[in-house]
């Protein structure tokens, strides 16, 4: 809390004398270190071999440090106008604990100052145009939907043409032409009843063909039988005639 108050009042004093942020941070580091380690500064100033003396301390720093050690109010802030900020920058590197205490504290203050200033400068990303450019997915969705429509429409039209045209024409030709011409030729070319039976039975099943052939075979057998009977009857009649002639000749001879 005390360090915060020191930093606050140092900042006020620096602003009053138009000091830079780096000088304000250096003053804050010196004031806090003098307040916390006042005896070390007195001992260092008393050692002639250290190269550091009370006379070499920046104006106003020792007075403010001593006032802070026993301060009960903020009256010590009136001493800020007496601070030699150029001497403060030089004093930082003169003390033997600069690298162990002052430099880390100064870097810490510079880091806090840069981080506290960052939000004001980082307000620009909030106005980023990235969200507005995210409307692009709508255009990609539109293209995908149009592609889906075109891709789904094309197959249906081509399939409709192929399925409606080719089979109907080929079936009509095959069903109307071939059977009628073959049947007309077979029916008009049949000269006899036997051939008519054969041609009429041809388009039927295998059983019909077999029955027609058997009928033809039976007719041939009957014809052969009739011829053989006629032959046998003729031979018998001829033999009987020949016998009668022989008997008549014998009678005449007697």
Swiss-Prot record:
UniProt modification remark: O-glycosylated.
Region feature (Disordered): 110-213
Ranges annotated as biased composition (Low complexity): 113-197
GO molecular function annotations of the record: structural constituent of cell wall
Positions of PIR1/2/ repeats: 210-224
Sequence repeat feature ranges: 114-119, 120-125, 126-131, 132-137, 138-143, 144-155, 156-167, 168-179, 180-191, 192-203
Induction, as annotated: Induced during anaerobic growth and by cold shock and glucose.
Polar residues bias (residue ranges): 201-213
UniProt-listed GO biological process terms: fungal-type cell wall organization
A Pfam family matched in the record: SRP1_TIP1
Protein's UniProt keywords contain Metal-binding: no
Keywords in alphabetical order: Cell wall, Glycoprotein, GPI-anchor, Lipoprotein, Membrane, Repeat, Secreted, Signal, Stress response
Annotated signal sequence range: 1-18
Cellular localization per UniProt: Secreted, Cell wall; Membrane
Entry membrane topology: Lipid-anchor; GPI-anchor
GO CC, alphabetical: cell periphery; extracellular region; fungal-type cell wall; fungal-type vacuole; side of membrane
Entry keyword annotation includes Transmembrane: no
Residue ranges, annotated region (5 X 12 AA approximate tandem repeats, Ala/Ser-rich): 144-203
Lipid anchor positions (GPI-anchor amidated asparagine): 233
Domain notes: The number of the intragenic tandem repeats varies between different S.cerevisiae strains.
UniProt cross-references to PANTHER family, sorted A to Z: CELL WALL PROTEIN CWP1-RELATED (PTHR31002:SF34), SERIPAUPERIN (PTHR31002)
Similarity field: Belongs to the SRP1/TIP1 family.
Protein name: Cold shock-induced protein TIR1
Species per Swiss-Prot/TrEMBL record: Saccharomyces cerevisiae (strain ATCC 204508 / S288c) (Baker's yeast)
